[in-house]
Amino acid sequence: MPTLRALECLVAVLDAGSITDAAAALHLSQPALSHQLAALEREIGAPVVERLPRGVRATAVGRTIEADARAALAAAERVVGAGRAVAHGAGGQLRVACAESMTAGLLAPVLRTWLRRNPLVRLTLTETTSADELVRLLDSGVADVAIGPRPTRWTGAEAVIGVEEIVAVLPPGHVLAEHKSVSFDQLTSEPLVHYHPDHGLAGWLDAEAARYGMVPSVGMRTRQASTAAQLAAAGVGVALVPTTALGTGFRGTLRRMRPRVQRDLLCLIGTPSDVLVRPFVADVLRRGVPIPAAVHAAPA
């Protein structure tokens, strides 16, 4: 395979029409330039330039490969330019994965600020309903950074964003609204708006309930935490919902759990040294875990 240096020497010789002038333009000695041309000719199996009494000219082979040689050099320049642009934050691609319940409340404000500050960065977002699926996206190279609860297995770099609370969203006029907080015992006979079995929240909440000897009674299932909150607010049944899924405009009735049900939220970092990942993670950590107004308004 010819080197870029050999192609550069060929193009310089064709432009200058002289070994001497081409060597001077590239700041090479004439023997060094001739060595590069000889290596190129050995690779191809034919001469690329013809030595004349005064100067040189391209052979038929040299004329044939000249355009591709110039294109290869231009492509190499673009590679270097693109890399430098990313290194200075002027471009590139950032691939983010996020637990779907956290996209609107936690991640959206960070994305808005990030894209405004880095308009040349191509940002892709993949949502999942499982923390272990976030790990799969990182391990397979689909995502550079992932935001979600703690997975069952992760040995890479991570940063704790904060603690997220799970609250009970109640139908309008529900008897449990008379209480300042709700326990799992009080939900034993309540048909819950629960999550599909393949949703990470389903297994996690079942395990939390089991700690208090309670097996959730399922009235219906949904795949989205925000939908569970809306269904509960519409009177379908009680839902246990992460606060990040409520959104700033949520107006339903909610109560905190007793004792509090909480989980850590993390940035799982697949490429810690990436020049885009580092500042993005820093922005997410500065944002922290938002607490919607409805949670602030709930009885203490």
Protein language model regions, located:
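A short LG(V/I)-centered, amphipathic sequence patch enriched
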Residues: E41-R63
